């Protein structure tokens, strides 16, 4: 897409990136197995650093039940189990995204059309929110809030905008990425926190980022 940046930023052409991510537009039911597989494969290959920084930032209690929304083939879940083998982890994602990994409990569904499964102490969204516009994110957070028990926790982890001043990865690279995707947006930690509070969450905590170009981690609670 950036081979022709003028057309990209003028909005004159259909971008290749938007064609690569049809799931973002709620077209999960129209995706074939190859579409789903290539998406999950790319996410898995780039998930290791995100998983490491996320898991290293937060406190995780033993034996809790954890749901990873949009967890694909289980790259994040696999790293989580390595560090915390007592966790009971499930993945909620569109059909076919776990085709090459049967080691985790997989719950098939789309958060566009289905409710978030219940019975979990913690629900994570790893590189999910920035793929979507504010209304879609708000709807998702409302569903997650409803699915969590009192005292339950949500974990958000993804690249974010600079808070007090722009940064080259969030404000430039990922902002261009979401622009080319034709949906979604990178947000600052305070913008994500505002969305969480507006949808019922409290005790929002933004963790110091180890590598902002990889991810920033936020947790919030249902009380």
Regions found by a protein language model. Name each.
Residues 1-64:
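Conserved Class I S-adenosyl-L-methionine-dependent methyltransferase catalytic core
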Residues 60, 69-223:
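Alpha-helical subdomain
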